[in-house]
């Protein structure tokens, strides 16, 4: 819509999103493109880029600058992972480093093998699979006759829960937890990690909505509103739902429903609707440093 040489063409985005075709979402007519950089400047999601002498125009002083952003306060992040699991664009990554169980709890398990029946009850009940009962052949010639006769406890896995001790029918297991009686006095486990948002972010704010510690800040590129059609206008083709990059649209009780908090006013749904039933009204945008008067006029169409 803004290209002064009409060198951009939008592909069949609904079919592309459904996997029916492998066409590009945007086709650039290179013969008519004059490399003005207008399209790359107005794209709030870095889908189009133009480089001049090896430098992205977004880093050059004379081109418009977007000021919207998304960021995570890592100092207060608890590395729960909700932002990563919920991101519709898989743009949030996190790595969590947990302490070893043996650093948090200490104890010992002893087995009286004279009383042990090797019945495997403790092995099957152990919640962390710390107990292994094996059948070690007594004869190298008849390994098929081996019966369970060996028990091992992996103290690196054991959490000193005592389930094995309570379940043993022979009372053959003794369990002593050195730290359990002081559990309330022990320091909290130190959980470290790293969380970051990559360039696939579309600034929907869903991660911010779910974050239990309010450590995520999101400033969207546009302000305004999206008007969804009345029931009789919508034919339930769901093209708009397919192309929405932030899962802001869904069918509820047979009607198209919009999550306004998640909508980024990108206009993908408007372009996909075969009936032109959706209306986009932008009131402002986070685009600054528009120094060229002709560009100001063209870019202003985004708010019409």
What is each stretch, according to the model?
Residues 1-304:
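Flanking helices and flexible, charged tails adjoining ferredoxin-like Fe-S electron-transfer domains
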